[in-house]
């Protein structure tokens, strides 16, 4: 079998965004004409503060929010100390009588102050408790640290406040109503006036995103390449994902900004990590550092655990009492947020996408309620509700019933039981259509593994999607367990990957002039990191391990071009967007629809629009998703994908330039063909409304267009995967401790694998084509549920694969040109200069 090494390679600079003659530009300004914002040294921190102040709606809101955070921490510590040392619970529970009268026979009411101990007694009990004193001292030191940091941040944000007022000319009262694109456009203009960055004459939108999201882009790439230990197989639970805020904080502490991290400062990777000569020594140093941080986490585990429990109790106890079903609701997991995030996507942009996908995701997960669990919940709710109704009726008749011991507690518990049981009872009017719901979810979240399509009705797909969209109760439980589990993950799981992490940062870091060291994936260069099966065939030179998985490069490029219509992409990216535009035009014309790309109207479309959307862009998505199930006779399985793609292409063609004074619409009678705009503008579409629509409306249409592009690109990828089923996916080798590739012995005979090999982020095998009776059964499921067919069920000749040393798949007899260059030995690259990527 064919074997080849899968070592990371050094990337070469692929393009230069600098205008001619500005490659080595250093802008000099006379001393007397410098503004207060000329040559800001730490632009990463500066732009991050500008963005944070915008997201927090101004200086006043940010100031008050920070003050309340300090007060909240102080309240949790003080109130917990009071409950532990200053309350007489015997009086509170009526185990001890209190006599306020001279006549013992007279009845006396017990008040709350009666249960409070005197100040002297309370102080003495606190002083006698050594453990409590230790916790209070640590909490006090931490609070003083936060107070000093708060004062420092206020001084820094006051400078940002002045920058908004004088440089950007945006008053604080208007800031909550300005979009980030408006603020960003003014920053670009301010660069021309004040020379914020002296290394470039002009700033681009991508420069600002790189500054704000430098470390976040690295985290997205690490998750995309499956280098962080986030997946574990537990007995009885199977494969689980564990990624909490505490674990993420430790990852960032180790890699980015902590003492001894890989970065010299916010914008520069240390020089020794850019060369391969000391990779083993650096890996050992990183491994030791991870060990010490893991030990520190283990020592601080009791304090962090106590804080997590107290904070969770004070945060969710009232919510649980008021809305017992709140913990049964779902939320996007931290792993899901990182897996679904585009390169160069700000937090509010990600949150907006996930918010749009929340309702269809909830409906999809509700489709899988167990019939047995539903039956038990109905009967449990009946019995609990019957007892609760009797107690409520007795209380209405005579309120003295509440004075009986445990009656109020029983009423509360029965109410919680009824509410929880109702959350497991599905709506009797709900229609089971998981395929359509999954397509709606895909339109908003933009990413999903290949083997989900056509298998939306399977429990395996449901379980994997639950890793992205988890119960709120599971989220809280993971955060509570985080102080205990995090040290174990750091010491036993992250340390063996130290060498791979060192290689990753060396080979996937480029130095951009005027920006600093950035993750090469964040350049969104389809030539360096594109995937052949994601419209990059013939346009990419990336090897297997250089390719971003799940179409991350292509979808991120499309998202950034739509979100920032003024951005001028490099040549390769422009060619990719132009190719996609031409493909949209061809498929839209082949759809056989009306001249303007108008989707046919019928009663079902109108009802779906009225039920699923309140705005025209969302109704267009509803039309596209529901179209194939509601229009025309059923097609063969191999033709359904073509019809899906044609419908999405027709919808994309309906995004056309608006004439002055024309109302915004998703069904303009003209198409983008011959509109005269360049490939990027035509592909994004949203730029043609600039200056004619308000920013919020423009953002809504841009989001809708990106949703349609995501559906369209996934359909193209699916058809290319069917034509070329062998998908080359990067996988790390679990047993590789040195990072160097070692050939793995394979059998002599050819062995067939699943038509769509497992994904890096979701390494679960797709269903194999089964026996005839299995195929017939799947056909029955397809007739029942509708939607996209499973490409894995299409009969085809078996393909021959060989197992890569790091877990990927390679076709037998693959060309030797795909072999990467071996990593040099110790000291072989000591004299090589660091890689520079001029932009």
From Swiss-Prot:
InterPro entries associated with the record: Autophagy-rel_prot_9
Function of the protein: Phospholipid scramblase involved in autophagy by mediating autophagosomal membrane expansion. Cycles between the preautophagosomal structure/phagophore assembly site (PAS) and the cytoplasmic vesicle pool and supplies membrane for the growing autophagosome. Lipid scramblase activity plays a key role in preautophagosomal structure/phagophore assembly by distributing the phospholipids that arrive through ATG2 (ATG2A or ATG2B) from the cytoplasmic to the luminal leaflet of the bilayer, thereby driving autophagosomal membrane expansion.
Keywords: Acetylation, Autophagy, Cytoplasmic vesicle, Endoplasmic reticulum, Endosome, Glycoprotein, Golgi apparatus, Lipid transport, Membrane, Mitochondrion, Phosphoprotein, Transmembrane, Transmembrane helix, Transport, Ubl conjugation
Family of the protein in this entry: Belongs to the ATG9 family.
Residues annotated with N-acetylalanine modification: 2
GO molecular function terms attached to this record: phospholipid scramblase activity
Glycosylation sites: 99
Intramembrane segments: 291-301, 320-328, 471-480, 484-492
Top-rank lineage group of the source organism: Eukaryota
Lumenal side: 85-128, 398-406
Annotated organism of origin: Bos taurus
Entry annotated with the keyword Transport: yes
UniProt modification remark: Ufmylated in a DDRGK1 dependent manner.
Stated name of the protein: Autophagy-related protein 9A
GO terms for cellular component: autophagosome; autophagosome membrane; endoplasmic reticulum membrane; Golgi apparatus; Golgi membrane; late endosome membrane; mitochondrial membrane; mitochondrion
Biased segments, Acidic residues type: 737-747, 823-832
Subcellular location, principal: membrane
Subcellular location: Preautophagosomal structure membrane; Cytoplasmic vesicle, Autophagosome membrane; Golgi apparatus, trans-Golgi network membrane; Late endosome membrane
Domain notes: Forms a homotrimer with a solvated central pore, which is connected laterally to the cytosol through the cavity within each protomer. Acts as a lipid scramblase that uses its central pore to function: the central pore opens laterally to accommodate lipid headgroups, thereby enabling lipid flipping and redistribution of lipids added to the outer leaflet of ATG9A-containing vesicles, thereby enabling growth into autophagosomes.
Membrane recorded as keyword: yes
Transmembrane portions of the chain: 62-84, 129-154, 372-397, 407-424
Coiled coil: none
Catalytic activity, reaction form: a 1,2-diacyl-sn-glycero-3-phosphocholine(in) = a 1,2-diacyl-sn-glycero-3-phosphocholine(out); a 1,2-diacyl-sn-glycero-3-phospho-L-serine(in) = a 1,2-diacyl-sn-glycero-3-phospho-L-serine(out); a 1,2-diacyl-sn-glycero-3-phosphoethanolamine(in) = a 1,2-diacyl-sn-glycero-3-phosphoethanolamine(out)
């Amino acid at each position: 079998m064919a074997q080849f090494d899968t070592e990371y390679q050094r990337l070469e600079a692929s393009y230069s965004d600098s205008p001619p003659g500005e490659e080595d530009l250093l802008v000099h300004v006379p001393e007397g004409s410098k503004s207060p914002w000329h040559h800001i040294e730490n632009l990463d921190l500066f732009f991050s503060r500008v963005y944070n102040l915008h997201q927090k709606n101004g200086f006043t809101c940010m100031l008050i929010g920070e003050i309340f955070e300090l007060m909240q921490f102080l309240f949790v510590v003080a109130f917990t100390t009071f409950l532990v040392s200053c309350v007489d619970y015997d009086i509170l529970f009526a185990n001890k009588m209190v006599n306020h009268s001279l006549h013992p026979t007279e009845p006396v009411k017990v008040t709350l102050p009666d249960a409070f101990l005197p100040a002297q007694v309370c102080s003495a009990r606190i002083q006698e408790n050594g453990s409590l004193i230790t916790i209070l001292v640590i909490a006090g030191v931490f609070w003083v640290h936060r107070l000093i940091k708060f004062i420092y941040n206020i001084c820094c944000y006051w400078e940002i406040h002045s920058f908004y007022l004088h440089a950007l000319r945006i008053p604080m009262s208007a800031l909550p109503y300005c979009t980030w694109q408006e603020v960003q456009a003014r920053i670009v203009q301010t660069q021309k006036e004040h020379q914020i960055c002296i290394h470039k004459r002009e700033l681009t939108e991508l420069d600002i995103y790189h500054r704000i999201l430098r470390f976040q882009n690295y985290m997205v790439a690490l998750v995309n390449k499956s280098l962080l230990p986030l997946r574990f197989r537990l007995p009885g639970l199977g494969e689980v994902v564990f990624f909490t805020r505490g674990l993420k904080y430790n990852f960032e502490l180790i890699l980015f900004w902590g003492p001894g991290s890989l970065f010299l400062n916010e914008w520069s990777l240390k020089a020794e990590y850019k060369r391969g000569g000391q990779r083993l020594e650096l890996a050992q140093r990183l491994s030791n550092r991870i060990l010490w941080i893991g030990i520190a986490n283990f020592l601080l585990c009791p304090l962090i655990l106590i804080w997590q429990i107290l904070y969770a109790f004070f945060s969710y106890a009232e919510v649980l009492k008021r809305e017992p079903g709140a913990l049964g609701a779902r939320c996007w997991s931290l792993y899901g947020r990182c897996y679904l995030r585009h390169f160069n996507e700000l937090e509010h942009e990600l949150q907006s996408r996930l918010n749009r996908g929340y309702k269809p995701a909830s409906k999809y997960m509700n489709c899988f309620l167990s019939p047995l669990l539903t039956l038990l919940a109905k009967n449990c709710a009946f019995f609990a509700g019957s007892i609760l109704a009797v107690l409520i009726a007795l209380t209405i008749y005579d309120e003295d019933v509440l004075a009986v011991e445990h009656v109020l507690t029983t009423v509360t518990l029965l109410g919680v039981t009824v509410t929880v049981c109702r959350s497991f009872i599905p709506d009797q009017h709900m229609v089971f259509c998981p395929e359509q719901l999954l397509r709606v979810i895909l339109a908003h979240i933009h990413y999903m593994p290949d083997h989900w399509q056509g298998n939306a009705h399977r429990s395996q797909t449901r379980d994997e999607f639950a890793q992205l969209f988890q119960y709120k109760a599971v989220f809280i439980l993971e955060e509570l367990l985080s102080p205990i589990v995090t040290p174990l993950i750091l010491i036993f799981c992250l340390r063996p990957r130290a060498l791979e992490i060192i290689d990753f940062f060396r080979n996937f870091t480029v130095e951009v002039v005027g920006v600093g060291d950035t993750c090469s994936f964040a350049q969104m260069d389809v030539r360096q990191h594109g995937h052949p099966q994601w419209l990059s065939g013939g346009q990419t030179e990336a090897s297997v391990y250089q390719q971003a998985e799940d179409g991350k490069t292509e979808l991120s490029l499309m998202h950034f071009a739509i979100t920032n219509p003024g951005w001028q992409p490099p040549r390769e990216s422009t060619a990719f967007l132009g190719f996609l535009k031409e493909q949209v035009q061809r498929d839209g014309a082949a759809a056989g629809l009306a001249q303007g790309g108008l989707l046919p109207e019928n009663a079902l479309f109108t009802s779906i629009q009225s039920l699923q959307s309140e705005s025209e862009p969302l109704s267009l998505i509803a039309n596209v998703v529901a179209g194939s199930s509601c229009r025309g006779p059923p097609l063969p399985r191999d033709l359904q994908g073509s019809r899906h793609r044609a419908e999405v292409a027709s919808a994309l063609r309906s995004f056309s330039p608006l004439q002055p004074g024309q109302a915004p619409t998703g069904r303009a009678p003209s198409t983008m063909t011959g509109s005269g705009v360049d490939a990027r503008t035509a592909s994004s579409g949203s730029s043609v409304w600039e200056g004619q629509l308000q920013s919020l409306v423009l953002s809504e249409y841009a989001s809708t267009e990106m949703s349609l592009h995501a559906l369209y690109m996934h359909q193209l990828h699916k058809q290319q995967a069917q034509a070329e089923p062998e998908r080359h996916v990067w996988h790390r080798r679990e047993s590789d401790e040195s990072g160097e590739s070692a050939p793995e012995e394979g059998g002599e005979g050819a062995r067939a694998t699943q038509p769509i090999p497992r994904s890096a982020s979701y390494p679960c095998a797709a269903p194999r084509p089964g026996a005839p009776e299995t195929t017939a059964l799947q056909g029955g499921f397809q007739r029942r549920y509708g939607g996209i067919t499973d490409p894995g069920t299409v009969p085809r000749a078996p393909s021959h694969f060989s197992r890569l040393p790091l877990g990927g798949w390679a076709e037998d007899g693959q060309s030797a040109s795909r072999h990467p260059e071996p990593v040099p030995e110790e000291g072989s690259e000591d004299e090589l200069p660091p890689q520079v990527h001029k932009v």
